[in-house]
C-alpha cells in the first residue's frame, strides 16, 4: 500500500508542475512573436493574481484589491489573443478563457497552500514572487503601449 501511495505521489506531482510553471523565464520579445505563448502567459498572470486575491482577501482586503485589479486589467487581452488564435467569436473566447483561468486559479491556490504548510509562506521557496513581478511588467508594458497609442491618435 505504501508503494502505491508513493507511486501516485510521483505521478501526481509532475502533472501539477506542468500546470504551474515559472513565467518569468520568458522575455517580452518571445511574447510578441508567439500568440500561443502570449495567451499562456496572460492566462497564467490572471490566474496567479486571482489566486493571490482569494488567499489574502480576508486578512488584507486593500492589497487583495490591487491583485484583483491586475487580473481584471489583463483579462480582456487574454480573451482577444484567444479569439485571434482560435478564430472564434467573443462569447466563445470569453467562456473558454474564464474556464481556463478558473481551473488554473485553483491550481495556483493549491500550490500556494501546500507551500504555505511547508514553508509557512505562500511565496517562500517558490517562483511565485518573481512571477507576480513579471506579471506586473507585462501589465506595465500593455499600459505603456496603450498610452503611446493614445498620444499618436
Residue ranges and their predicted role:
Residues 13, 41-42, 131:
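Generic detector of short, well-ordered, non-transmembrane alpha-helical segments enriched
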Residues 75-153:
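Compact alpha-helical subdomains of small soluble proteins
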Residues 5, 50-51, 140:
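Residue-level marker of positions within ordered structural domains that often coincide
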Residues 18-36:
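Short N-terminal segments immediately surrounding and downstream of signal-peptide cleavage
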Amino acid at each position: 500500500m505504501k508503494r502505491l501511495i508513493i507511486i501516485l505521489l510521483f505521478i501526481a506531482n509532475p502533472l501539477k508542475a506542468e500546470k504551474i510553471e515559472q513565467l518569468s523565464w520568458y522575455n517580452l520579445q518571445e511574447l510578441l512573436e508567439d500568440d500561443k505563448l502570449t495567451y499562456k502567459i496572460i492566462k497564467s498572470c490572471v490566474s496567479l493574481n486571482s489566486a493571490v486575491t482569494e488567499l489574502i482577501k480576508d486578512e488584507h482586503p486593500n492589497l487583495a484589491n490591487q491583485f484583483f485589479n491586475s487580473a481584471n486589467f489583463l483579462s480582456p487581452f487574454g480573451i482577444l489573443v484567444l479569439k485571434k488564435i482560435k478564430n472564434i467569436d467573443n462569447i466563445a473566447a470569453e467562456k473558454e478563457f474564464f474556464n481556463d483561468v478558473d481551473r488554473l486559479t485553483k491550481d495556483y491556490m493549491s500550490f500556494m497552500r501546500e507551500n504555505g504548510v511547508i514553508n509557512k509562506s505562500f511565496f517562500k521557496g517558490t517562483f511565485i514572487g518573481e512571477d507576480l513581478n513579471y506579471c506586473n511588467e507585462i501589465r506595465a508594458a500593455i499600459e505603456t503601449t496603450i498610452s503611446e497609442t493614445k498620444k499618436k491618435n
